[in-house]
């Protein structure tokens, strides 16, 4: 599947917010906070149209989870046909992706790194290797680091950094002694820290 592999700070500057795409070890806040989108001279901003504002919200969410338009649209279509609030269900579906859960548990410092771990078959789900980043987890599922990868300095460093920067969301439980974690509940809106207005995205796709 095609993926964006270019500079992630450029993406975050375009969206105007930190989308947690880059490790805090290397994140350059001076570059991020330069005025204006990348490649454009500083000038007074014009008024953003309603469509423009809706598009920016969609791009923020899509890029935060590393998705292309076709895949993101499938998540929206599924959410729109489910029972409940469409925007919140959309976020829930995205949070339940395996790459996101590996990131949320602190085994990877970005979702992009989590996808790499999964693609290289370093992640187990319920004791079986899974190499699909979009694999959807359910309540009761157990995520583990493959035995041979547990000694990697990546994992120990990532756990240490994650514990210092962010906690584990309450819908997950981590067992760092055994390099694993469990999905104990479905994520709710207040568990998700992304600065996105999901209802605006629903309005965009509803046109």
Curated annotation (Swiss-Prot):
Keywords: Ribonucleoprotein, Ribosomal protein, RNA-binding, rRNA-binding. GO terms for biological process: ribosomal small subunit biogenesis; translation. Gene3D superfamilies: Ribosomal Protein S4 Delta 41, Chain A, domain 1, RNA-binding S4 domain. SMART domains: Ribosomal_S4, S4. It holds the Pfam family S4. One of its GO terms (molecular function) is rRNA binding. InterPro entries: Ribosomal_uS4 (IPR022801), Ribosomal_uS4_bac-type (IPR005709), Ribosomal_uS4_CS (IPR018079), Ribosomal_uS4_N (IPR001912), S4_RNA-bd (IPR002942), S4_RNA-bd_sf (IPR036986). Residues 96-156 form the S4 RNA-binding domain. GO terms for cellular component: small ribosomal subunit. The keyword Ribosomal protein applies. PROSITE patterns: RIBOSOMAL_S4, S4. Belongs to the universal ribosomal protein uS4 family. Part of the 30S ribosomal subunit. Contacts protein S5. The interaction surface between S4 and S5 is involved in control of translational fidelity. One of the primary rRNA binding proteins, it binds directly to 16S rRNA where it nucleates assembly of the body of the 30S subunit. With S5 and S12 plays an important role in translational accuracy. This is Small ribosomal subunit protein uS4. It comes from Leptospira interrogans serogroup Icterohaemorrhagiae serovar Lai (strain 56601). The gene is rpsD.
